[in-house]
Amino acid sequence: MVTLNIYSIIKMKRFPKRNYLRKTKVSFFNRSQRHFSQHLNIDIIGPLFKITRKDEKHYNFQYNDGLNILDTPFNNDDDHCTPGKLYFSDSKNICKYLGFGDNLRKISLPIDNPDFKMTKCLYGEKYGANMLIFGEKFDLDKVETYQKMILMDIDIRAGNDNAMIIAAQKGNLEIVKFLVESGANVKSQDNCAVRLASEFGHLDVVEYLYKSGANVKADGNYAITWACKNGHLPVIEFLTSVGADIKAAQNLPIKMAAIGGHLNVIKYLVDRGANISTDNDYVFNIACRNGHTDLAEYAVSLGADIFSDGCYGIDHAIRYNHYKIVDKFIGT
């Protein structure tokens, strides 16, 4: 069986030389019964790719090298991310989907197979087929993959620098540096890269992005707020040193730290002026709700009024069976 990818078809048809990152309309014609049962007129941009997870499964379908044939009826509608299709995208758009997996697979289509079916999804620049041929596999956690992407005419800035943002979220500094040096904007999507790097505790990435021009106070001091929620004290210390506001949004960082139960972060913020009694002793209330006895004790030591009208901490402790806290503050 002859199998070709779309990029090869374009070159074989001896079309005028062009930039293959530009949109090229490729038509499939039903010239005989051994080709297609219908005419497909779908816009394809360059070579084709798919993102897969480590186990290379999706909707319980196991992908393998070579030909993959859908084992359920083909879903011929234009919905996306629904069962009944094997999904893929093109070189202009594949980087929009990097967050959905761990591998980049180069694919081709068995266009000479009379049973081959394909549709374009209504939302998102991707396609669905009942057959795909898996070629090379590239690890999305290796910088070499992104270097090869450029050689394969993949738009590494697709989705408003989605590749850089995903790398920042994962803490892959080498990839972040490569993408920035290749033209990615560290401020894309309201400084999303530094916000996510902070949220997930990747100090080296946060420092690099800040030095490269990212705004650590973007989106209402999102970076320090979510670093507090997840207890990333080294990131919090750095963000504070470069101007992040620990009192942002009515002391939201200390409230988020309380939700996460991070006493060390709470103490750090209090030492720098955060108000532990904010919002009717929210810190004490949420500590009781989540069973964080040490945090509840610390809040009381700094003046939390456990019997005030707006303080529901003890009620929460009783409701959620945190009897150690109940015994601590009101006895048996």
Curated annotation (Swiss-Prot):
Keywords: ANK repeat, Repeat. ANK repeats lie at residues 159-188, 190-218, 219-248, 249-278, 280-308. It comes from the Viruses. The keyword Repeat applies. The keyword Repeat applies. InterPro entries: Ankyrin_rpt (IPR002110), Ankyrin_rpt-contain_sf (IPR036770). Pfam families: Ank, Ank_2. This is Putative ankyrin repeat protein R896. It comes from Acanthamoeba polyphaga mimivirus.
